[in-house]
UniProtKB/Swiss-Prot annotation:
Keywords from the named record: Membrane, Mitochondrion, Mitochondrion outer membrane, Protein transport, Signal-anchor, Transmembrane, Transmembrane helix, Transport
Gene Ontology CC terms: mitochondrial outer membrane translocase complex
Record topological domains on the Cytoplasmic side: 1-26
Subunit structure: Forms part of the TOM (translocase of outer membrane) complex.
Signal peptide segment: none
Bilayer topology: Single-pass membrane protein
InterPro entries on file: Tom5
Compartments in which it is found: Mitochondrion outer membrane
Gene Ontology BP, a term: protein targeting to mitochondrion
Family statement: Belongs to the Tom5 family.
Name listed for the protein in its UniProt record: Mitochondrial import receptor subunit tom5
Function (record text): Component of the TOM (translocase of outer membrane) receptor complex responsible for the recognition and translocation of cytosolically synthesized mitochondrial preproteins.
Lineage of producing organism: Eukaryota, Fungi, Dikarya, Ascomycota, Taphrinomycotina
Ranges that cross the membrane: 27-44
Name of the coding gene: tom5
Amino acid sequence: MFSGAGRPSKEQIKQYDNLAVGEMKKGASVAAVLLLTPFVISFFQKMRA
């Protein structure tokens, strides 16, 4: 993951942290949408019934 020998610089660490946080937020929102979809569909079906 890190290029070159030795410890990564603080800037690199910050970059990777931001990337990881962004990916986690993306994953969490996708998971939330997938979890909520059945409830939303059944809600609209009840409204139309």
